[in-house]
UniProtKB/Swiss-Prot annotation:
HAMAP family: REV_HIV1. Homomultimer; when bound to the RRE. Multimeric assembly is essential for activity and may involve XPO1. Binds to human KPNB1, XPO1, TNPO1, RANBP5 and IPO7. Interacts with the viral Integrase. Interacts with human KHDRBS1. Interacts with human NAP1; this interaction decreases Rev multimerization and stimulates its activity. Interacts with human DEAD-box helicases DDX3 and DDX24; these interactions may serve for viral RNA export to the cytoplasm and packaging, respectively. It comes from Human immunodeficiency virus type 1 group M subtype B (isolate SF162). A motif (Nuclear localization signal and RNA-binding (RRE)) lies at residues 34-50. GO terms for biological process: mRNA transport; viral process. This is Protein Rev. InterPro entries: REV_protein.
Length: 116
């Protein structure tokens, strides 16, 4: 893949194909049978999925030599964060939308409910 150093494109593609094969080797369980049988099949399927996920993480970390987790984003400390609305903050494009209407007298729907 473009911009990657340390491993070739073919090695990365081969690893991805192998992990894809692992996931395809565990199809969804059949919806047939009693409730208990379906529940047991789903439980075994979920366990196999967890095993495949851990094997895939191991393959990526050892074979390709990189972490499965993305690099964490470095955020500034909370003390430095502030909201300063002295400037035009977030109102662009919303001017005139939902502006309040001032009525001379209250409409009939707000009357006390007595008929004249």
């Amino acid at each position: 893949m473009a911009g990657r150093s340390g491993d070739s494109d073919e090695e990365l593609l081969q690893t991805v194909r192998f992990i894809k094969f692992l996931y395809q080797s565990n199809p969804l369980p059949s919806p047939k049978g009693t409730r208990q049988a379906r529940r047991n099949r789903r439980r075994r399927w979920r366990e196999r999925q967890r095993q495949i996920q851990s094997i895939s993480a191991w393959i990526i970390s050892t074979h390709l030599g990189r972490s499965t987790e993305p690099v964490p984003l470095q955020l500034p400390p909370l003390e430095r964060l502030n909201l300063d609305c002295s400037e035009d903050c977030g109102t662009s494009g919303t001017q005139g939308v939902g502006s309040p209407q001032v009525l001379g007298e209250s409409p009939a729907v707000l009357d006390s409910g007595t008929k004249e």
